[in-house]
């Protein structure tokens, strides 16, 4: 099963589609959702970038950074989830630029009024719309896809309605299964579909790292 999935992933990515924009990831940014889809943390762990197509995009993320306290100790600051929407038309690279976050005062200020910039490859600011993602769920494990779908349907500052129903009906992910094929459990198909999606977005180095990791996993 393992070898089959890895082989399929390689086949799906050759030839590799031409992408117009490289999103450079920051070590201080925990990416949660991209364009309405939950990010595959196992695939993107350690990745330097993600390839995007031209057009509108939406990121949901948290800023995670070690800050210094007044007693000379340190703690990990984690921001509330943020939503940023932008357009990559005619842009070949997107880079995060965060404000200074070194102490408790700066962290509290960021919580109250978050701000950041996205820069293109020439360090020119890209127009963005930034907002805080208000979490409505009281569950311990937050389903960020559901929260983002709700946000995008509510006409908020950084809402992009076209991503509101991207994952609303998982049955659309099964449309490529032939009626003659032996259909595996739906959860397995959805997992593979999501994995293929993120594999296609990852940069070549990340793909290679993931394939090496997958080869070392025990067969199911």
Curated annotation (Swiss-Prot):
Protein name as catalogued: UPF0319 protein YccT
TM regions (residue ranges): none
Thylakoid in keyword set: no
Keywords, comma-separated and alphabetical: Signal
Organism ancestry: Bacteria, Pseudomonadati, Pseudomonadota, Gammaproteobacteria, Enterobacterales
Signal peptide: 1-20
The species this protein was found in: Shigella flexneri serotype 5b (strain 8401)
InterPro entries (UniProt xref): UPF0319
Disulfide bonds: none
